[in-house]
Amino acid sequence: LFLHDRLLNAAIQGLVDIKKYSETTPGMISFVGLPYEMNGKLYNVVAGIMNGCILGMVPKMYLPNYGEFYERRQFTPGFNECVYVDVDGEEVPFGSELLFTFNNNRKVKIGVEICEDLWTPQPPSIKHAMNGATIIVNASASNETIGKDTYRKQLVSGQSARLVCGYVYSSAGGGESTQDIVFSAHNLICENGSTLAEAHKFADESVYADIDVERICSERRRMSTYAVDENSTYTEVQAQNFINKELELIRYFDKAPFVPSDKKERDSRCEEILNIQSYGLKKRLEHTNCKNAVIGISGGLDSTLALLVTVRAFDLCGFDRSGIHCITMPCFGTTDRTYNNAVKLTKQLGCS
């Protein structure tokens, strides 16, 4: 069907219809996948649409031709160079190296890759991010096999972490009725390794989330190894009047982000913290051949943790706990309760 003029013309008409409808949703950018013919070759592309305009078209770079896939029968791999094509009387940029930017929010830069592009050793999203993209959009048609959903989620989440970006992954659903494979509409939104939203498989449901672009930019500034390409060959397509007003947050921000709410995970995190500190102290004790430690304790949280870490380190070294000397240091904030806690803790741990 991809080779039939009727389907190709209908796809263009559908794109034009969506373009016209976008005039009624000002400030919202949409990405639509379609087959597109250029110079006698057929490309698998995604078009960016906003405010009644087709902003650009990005071709798929990697075409799978293994297993249940045979895209090379019909399609031609995309290219990096930006050329211009006529779509409904508009001159539209076409090429892989496109970034969608906005005149009133320069931190939002969107790069596009398509399905298999993400599953390759060198996904285009790497270049997109190294050229400034803070959000990656992937319009996909990823079929279902046993266990593939778990791998897919790990792939999307991992890529968002590796690139320090937001990753919006939209996959085909039950509407693909003419295929000999099954699609589940496994839609995902991830940010820097965290999954913000995930659709239930086979539910054909939409997902949405708040992506913290300012956090992404802040994290990238902190990373001295995250260097943006200074000799960029990318074309930035600037859209006008991106939504830039305060909206009600739909994202939940944990008041204690470093303390897991799940007890099992919280216990594991606490054990990890204790081990990191204890093994660090163990190394220092062995290096200095020191078998004594002096700790000021008050019965409060900080000194209690310091004591527990020291006890664990002494046990790891095989040292006698009597070498840990606990000194109470009462002050204006000390109460009978905290003082007694400090004394009891010292005795029960077998310290001096």
Residues covered by each model-derived region:
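Enzyme catalytic cores with a strong preference for nitrogen-chemistry domains
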Residues: 1-296, 307-308, 312-321, 348
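Conserved adenosine/adenylate-binding substructure
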Residues: 111-113, 343, 352
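ATP-dependent adenylation/pyrophosphate-handling site
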Residues: 293-297, 301-343
